[in-house]
A protein has these predicted regions:
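Helix-turn-helix
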Residues: 18, 26-60, 64, 68
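N-terminal intrinsically disordered/low-complexity leader segments
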Residues: 1-14, 214-221
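Short secondary-structure transition hinges
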Residues: 73-84, 103-140, 187-195
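Hydrophobic/aromatic-rich alpha-helical bundle segments in the mid-to-C-terminal region
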Residues: 111-113, 127-136, 145-202, 212-221
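N-terminal hydrophobic signal/anchor transmembrane helix of membrane proteins
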Residues: 89-105, 109, 195-216
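Short hydrophobic clusters on alpha-helical segments that form packing/core surfaces
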Residues: 19-27, 166, 205
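Hydrophobic alpha-helical connector segments
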Residues: 78-112, 159-166
Length: 221
């Protein structure tokens, strides 16, 4: 989904890795605009010129960070590969489980969920790139299953609303976690709790899809 890293300047290079490790904390805390590359370089224990050498600019560092964490997310929670004969409900459940893990798992090495939430709230030039390389492939997988569920006659607008309703259930736990923890003091997203959340979203979504399908049939009866 994302381009392969240049081996000569990969995330494994000690200086590059040090910069990425510090940059994730700075960009998440301060946002892209307020983040200072001088602070990142100082905290990483490298010269400021190292950012230009490895990334070209502040913008290049930020985009590389997004791509690095998106790649980590794909590797740790890849899209499920299921036989087409597997019942559609099970395939949707597997897709939602992977999406939830990719975006919300606090134990994942990827921080792409929080990065993308920040990017959506305060867009930069990186948004178009990340939309094409990270967001759109996931949406297209979901739309493919929804098209299979609804059939060819249902307008794309209906599919998009259904897809956004499913994705929105996942994202709200990342965006509104300070509110959720006040509503539920023992709220947790680790291990089995994350699995239960994914199952809930899948069950809720499947019921909603069935209601939408009945509505569509009624409109065309």
């Amino acid at each position: 989904m994302l381009p392969e890293a240049d081996d000569s300047k990969s995330a494994a290079h000690p200086t590059r890795k040090a910069l990425l490790d510090v940059a994730i904390e700075v960009f998440l805390a301060d946002g892209f605009k307020a983040a200072r590359v001088a602070d990142i370089a100082q905290q990483a224990g490298v010269r400021l010129s190292a950012i230009n050498y490895h990334f070209g600019s502040k913008e290049g560092l930020y985009l590389a960070l997004l791509q690095h964490h998106a790649d980590l997310a794909w590797r740790t929670a890849p899209p499920p590969v299921l036989d087409p004969d597997t019942p559609l409900q099970q395939r949707l459940q597997a897709l939602i489980a992977a999406l939830v893990r990719r975006m919300l798992d606090p134990d994942s090495p990827s921080r792409i969920g929080r990065l993308m939430i920040r990017e959506v709230v305060n867009p930069t030039a990186a948004l178009d790139v990340m939309f094409e390389r990270f967001t759109l492939p996931q949406v297209n997988l979901l739309l493919g299953l929804l098209r299979e569920f609804f059939g060819p006659q249902v307008p794309r607008e209906v599919l998009l609303r259904a897809a956004l309703s499913i994705v929105g259930q996942c994202l709200v736990y990342g965006v509104a976690s300070p509110i959720i923890t006040r509503l539920q003091a023992d709220f947790d997203l680790r291990g089995a709790a994350l699995d239960r959340l994914a199952q809930h979203i899948a069950t809720f979504s499947w019921a909603g899809l069935q209601a939408l399908a009945a509505q569509q049939e009624g409109q065309h009866a």
